[in-house]
Curated annotation (Swiss-Prot):
Keyword Signal: yes
Gene Ontology CC: extracellular region
Involved pathway(s): Cell wall biogenesis; peptidoglycan biosynthesis
Top-level taxonomy: Bacteria, Bacillati, Actinomycetota, Actinomycetes, Kitasatosporales
Signal peptide as annotated in the record: 1-29
Biological processes, Gene Ontology terms: cell wall organization; peptidoglycan biosynthetic process; proteolysis; regulation of cell shape
Family to which this protein belongs: Belongs to the peptidase S11 family.
Protein's recorded name: D-alanyl-D-alanine carboxypeptidase
Source species of the chain: Streptomyces sp. (strain K15)
Active site residues according to the UniProt entry: 64, 67, 125
Consequence when changing residue 67 to H: Almost no activity
Amino acid sequence: MRLRRAAATVITTGALLAAGTLGATPATAVTKPTIAAVGGYAMNNGTGTTLYTKAADTRRSTGSTTKIMTAKVVLAQSNLNLDAKVTIQKAYSDYVVANKPSQAHLIVGDKVTVRQLLYGLMLPSGCDAAYALADKYGSGSQAAARVKSFIGKMNTAATNLGLHNTHFDSFDGIGNGANYSTPRHLTKIASSAMKNSTFRTVVKTKAYTAKTVTKTGSIRTMDTWKNTNGLLSSYSGAIGVKTGSGPEAKYCLVFAATRGGKTVIGTVLASTSIPARESDATKIMNYGFAL
């Protein structure tokens, strides 16, 4: 009798093992996160596969995430010399005084390299640096014409990427009612920009101290520019890319991180605060890496 019971136990245990049910843990489903932002999107940067969407194709104000395209246009210039010097004009200073946006605190009369301007553009989100770059790389005899030309290049770049829901009317995100994109499109702009090694280096830098040349030829050590993207410090594997904010845009963030050879890149638009946009991005990236 005992032998029969033992045999039955062995048979039953074997059947359970074969079926994979003994001690098995049910697979945990990955739950799509809830975010505070009005719109969001993320994709696998290597494959282009969509990982997350929330109103991903709705046009919204982009704030300073616009500067991703500003940098992309500059870096696409033929025969670009990153060490070329740009003299800071009073108009750039007057612009930030009048609009009170984020700035790199560039000094009128100083000579600043294009490379330094890119750091001033992307780390502290300097609208003065954006103006200087637009003035440098636009075409025309007057600053207004050059700026208009540069914005035209930004729109041409968007068109070339097939982004029909994106339009720029400013070089820095301080729009005049026609500066918009979508979470999906901003992600694609960032993905394209990240193909450039200089761009990648700039946007993953946490802090940068520029040494500029003054009107008298002396060297000025600027106050250190700190990256406004807090994820570079708080999220393992973060590699960029750009924050944005404004009365209409609210709180925006284009983000990217690499883990285990997989890069998740995405955007949140119109979140409720700086901590909220970083939390939104963290949730989306965790979700993207778990898929």
